[in-house]
Amino acid sequence: MEAAGALWRRRMQELARGAGKPHAPLFVPLIMGCAAQIEAIPAIDMVRDGTRLRKNLSELRRMLKLDALTCAVPSCMEAEAVGVEVSQDQWPPRIGTTAQVDVTAEIDADRLAASPRIAAALDAVRQIAVDPGEPVIAAALTGPAALVAQLRAAGVEAGDEAIYDFAGRILATLARLYAEAGVNLLSWHEAARPAEEQDDFWKGALGTAGNVARFHRVPPVLVLPASLAAGPWPAQAVPCPALNHPPLPPVRTHARAWAADPAGWPCLPVEGVAERLILTDAEVPPETEIATLKAQVERVRGE
């Protein structure tokens, strides 16, 4: 009989190919900062230490009886890795206001991999992936439009085409790094859909990163809030619309995004649904107490 971890990893590979049979969805809430409560340390310290990150995330996953854990959440780490200053005294970090970034430069994969938070996340992934009995390992990253907004907020000046190309190359490089480390699921999270004149550049960035993910048999999932998702869903990524998003014909919705606040989570569907994956649209608030989180996870599972 196929072990649960192996079963879910195979299902994620099928999702990347648009294949496979319907099944009860994999529940992957974006949990990161909450895990620091296990050691009673600041989250910003935990996310810079691969071993601590692995231990705390794995322990919290076991406490919550989840079949997946998330080793990275959207938290400005992509911008930080290319030279943007971010706050180091709070979680999640915030973008600084000045940066010298050349968007025409080649992406240095070694530099990205050496950025402290990315290095710790990759280290944690490798440690977890060594055990074939472990569950699905996910990485949730900043979407290209959100990354462009962060770069511009930091003072990076560039035209739309150049800066979206830069964002796409960053995310493609990270997709390769995470996939090679052992991640089974990649998601890109947007706060807003870009303006119409930027749409083609945005789709190009999604395609650049998504193609790399699919090459490694990892599904590239796009999470976009319902209130900001005007226009057809881009074909470059697996659609993961918000819970109240209208249907996406002719696209089949194999993933769904719930709100980050556990108090608003509905009950998990069991069988007979198209969704094979349920994420949260952002990180679960890090101040959420583990006992509260556990009670909410048990509630949505009907326990």
Swiss-Prot record:
UniProt catalytic activity: acetophenone + hydrogencarbonate + 2 ATP + H2O = 3-oxo-3-phenylpropanoate + 2 ADP + 2 phosphate + 2 H(+)
Protein name: Acetophenone carboxylase epsilon subunit
Gene: apc5
Inhibition and activation profile: Inhibited by zinc ions, carbamoylphosphate and beta,gamma-imido-ATP.
Cellular component aspect of the GO annotation: cytoplasm
EC numbers, comma separated: 6.4.1.8
Listed GO MF terms: ATP binding; ligase activity
Domain of life the protein comes from: Bacteria
Induction: By ethylbenzene, toluene and acetophenone.
InterPro entries in UniProt: ApcE
Highest classification ranks of the organism: Bacteria, Pseudomonadati, Pseudomonadota, Betaproteobacteria, Rhodocyclales
Cofactor(s) recorded in Swiss-Prot or TrEMBL: Mg(2+); Mn(2+)
Residue ranges that the Swiss-Prot or TrEMBL entry lists as coiled coil: none
Keywords assigned by UniProt, alphabetized: ATP-binding, Cytoplasm, Ligase, Nucleotide-binding
Note: The epsilon subunit dissociates during enzyme purification. However, Apc5 is required for acetophenone carboxylation and the enzyme complex is reconstituted using recombinant Apc5.
Known function: Catalyzes the carboxylation of acetophenone to form 3-oxo-3-phenylpropanoate (benzoylacetate) in the anaerobic catabolism of ethylbenzene. Also carboxylates propiophenone at the same rate and 4-acetyl-pyridine at lower rates.
Main location: cytoplasm
Quaternary structure and partners: Acetophenone carboxylase consists of five subunits; a heterooctameric subcomplex of two alpha (Apc1), two beta (Apc2), two gamma (Apc3) and two delta (Apc4) subunits assembles with the epsilon (Apc5) subunit in an unknown stoichiometry.
Free-text remark on how the cofactor is bound: Divalent metal cations. Magnesium or manganese are required for activity.
Localization in the cell: Cytoplasm
